[in-house]
Amino acid sequence: MTQKLVTKPFIEVLSGNRQASPPMWMMRQAGRYLPEYRATRAEAGSFLDLCFNAKLAAEVTLQPIRRFGFDAAIIFSDILVVPYALGRAVRFEVGEGPRLDPLNSPDLVGTLNGAIDLSKLEPVFEALRIVRSELAPETTLIGFCGAPFTVATYMVAGQGTSDQHPARLMAYQHPGAFARIIDVLVESSIQYLLKQLEAGADVLQIFDTWGGILPPREFEKWCIEPTRRIVEGVRKVSPGAKIIGFPRGAGAMLPDFIARTGVDAVSIDWTAEPNMIRERVQSKVAVQGNLDPLLLIAGGSALDQGVDDVLKNFSAGRHIFNLGHGITPDAPVAHVEQMVKRVRAYKG
């Protein structure tokens, strides 16, 4: 008896095959909007305790899959585990977000450890193995890292800021020191992503949350080029690796991003202009996005219209339905259910 071949709709889209009903998931789908997540988080203690408890991290990764039947699970972790594995002190203050010891001068950058200690991230890899063993074969497992520029913004400032100006200023005033941070993060990210593939990830996503704040010349230098190096480095070892880029806010710079980096897909935020995306981006790679997360708070007819607009704009090509950024903690579960039902009913 021959075994039935299982296809993953998510992988099909990344491989060039449009799906009549687009596969879907949500950025930050394992999060505080879910009561089961809040209960598990309370059991774990701190946010980092949850990230580094393989059993509990696997549990919260699986929770939105059980509840909504998404086509992809993304491992529960954080982009700042890479600085942690580089020996930087990383902590999360309640209500204030991440805190690190800042690398805000060339002398301090000189203290940066250049080699990542992957053993510190073993709980992430173990969580991937657990999730992979429990996921249905047709469900895709996503691993991820932060893009070097975005991670560097937190490392330089020691926290998030409204426009991440400390890192941008260092890049202008001390480009050699800033390049040193980027180089370390590129090599560390390659190693980290390869270990995630080894642990069971099917797809990788590179989150450049702050890339879109850069002007074109700096976007090319600090966003496109480091991402290209990561993609190249991963594929040198794993030639078939499927990789999604998310240079949030890149807008008109997206065509250059996809042409230069070699990603299989790009996530787009809700401000992306649909005609440009269809003509200059989706004609080359798959597109993921791009519902405004605020619509999941609004609900009702506004949410329905937003879902319909995304489907109308992108379903004729290769498309993965997602949000334009992460779901917020105050989004009602019922509104997520409303969105899922509407997307699943679509046959384009």
Swiss-Prot record:
<dbReference type="Pfam" id="PF01208">
    <property type="entry name" value="URO-D"/>
</dbReference>
<comment type="function">
    <text>Catalyzes the decarboxylation of four acetate groups of uroporphyrinogen-III to yield coproporphyrinogen-III.</text>
</comment>
<keyword id="KW-0627">Porphyrin biosynthesis</keyword>
<feature type="binding site">
    <location>
        <begin position="28"/>
        <end position="32"/>
    </location>
    <ligand>
        <name>substrate</name>
    </ligand>
</feature>
<dbReference type="InterPro" id="IPR000257">
    <property type="entry name" value="Uroporphyrinogen_deCOase"/>
</dbReference>
<comment type="pathway">
    <text>Porphyrin-containing compound metabolism; protoporphyrin-IX biosynthesis; coproporphyrinogen-III from 5-aminolevulinate: step 4/4.</text>
</comment>
<feature type="binding site">
    <location>
        <position position="325"/>
    </location>
    <ligand>
        <name>substrate</name>
    </ligand>
</feature>
<feature type="binding site">
    <location>
        <position position="78"/>
    </location>
    <ligand>
        <name>substrate</name>
    </ligand>
</feature>
<feature type="binding site">
    <location>
        <position position="209"/>
    </location>
    <ligand>
        <name>substrate</name>
    </ligand>
</feature>
<dbReference type="GO" id="GO:0005829">
    <property type="term" value="C:cytosol"/>
</dbReference>
<comment type="subunit">
    <text>Homodimer.</text>
</comment>
<dbReference type="GO" id="GO:0019353">
    <property type="term" value="P:protoporphyrinogen IX biosynthetic process from glutamate"/>
</dbReference>
<keyword id="KW-0963">Cytoplasm</keyword>
<keyword id="KW-0456">Lyase</keyword>
<comment type="similarity">
    <text>Belongs to the uroporphyrinogen decarboxylase family.</text>
</comment>
<protein>
    <recommendedName>
        <fullName>Uroporphyrinogen decarboxylase</fullName>
        <ecNumber>4.1.1.37</ecNumber>
    </recommendedName>
</protein>
<feature type="site" description="Transition state stabilizer">
    <location>
        <position position="78"/>
    </location>
</feature>
<dbReference type="InterPro" id="IPR038071">
    <property type="entry name" value="UROD/MetE-like_sf"/>
</dbReference>
<dbReference type="InterPro" id="IPR006361">
    <property type="entry name" value="Uroporphyrinogen_deCO2ase_HemE"/>
</dbReference>
<feature type="binding site">
    <location>
        <position position="154"/>
    </location>
    <ligand>
        <name>substrate</name>
    </ligand>
</feature>
<dbReference type="GO" id="GO:0004853">
    <property type="term" value="F:uroporphyrinogen decarboxylase activity"/>
</dbReference>
<keyword id="KW-0210">Decarboxylase</keyword>
